[in-house]
Design a protein with these regions (language model features):
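Iron-associated oxidoreductase/ferritin-like identity signal
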Residues: 1-116
């Protein structure tokens, strides 16, 4: 059962879509917080085996966060539009924004960044 501390608005007046959106956002926030905690612990420890475990756990949390972001992209037009504009691009991010906001029509096609 939800508590009033979890919602800024009366959740009984919210659609299922809005509730699920909020759930996804909260989940992504929690996963990113866990990523940060595991990363801090991995950086702080001098035990190499523990560091590898913590880095593994951190990377699992990153996977979970990305899954949540993908859900938001699939279910929210604005997330989809902005993710398609900015993710997997190269160059200065603010220039990508400038191009996207000053050029009529769709944003410039994004290219996957090489990891090589």
């Amino acid at each position: 059962m939800a508590t009033s501390a979890e919602w800024h608005e009366d959740y009984t007046k919210m659609s299922e879509e809005a509730l699920n959106f909020s759930r996804a956002v909260k989940s992504v926030q929690e996963e990113l917080e866990a990523v940060d905690w595991y990363n801090q612990r991995a950086q702080a420890t001098t035990d190499q085996q523990l560091r590898r475990i913590l880095e593994h756990n951190r990377d699992e949390e990153i996977e979970h966060a990305i899954m949540g972001l993908e859900y938001l992209r699939r279910t929210n037009k604005a997330f989809d539009e902005h993710m398609r504009t900015y993710l997997f691009t190269e160059g200065d991010i603010t220039e990508i924004e400038e191009h996207a906001t000053t050029t009529p029509g769709p944003a410039a096609p994004s290219r996957p960044k090489s990891r090589g």
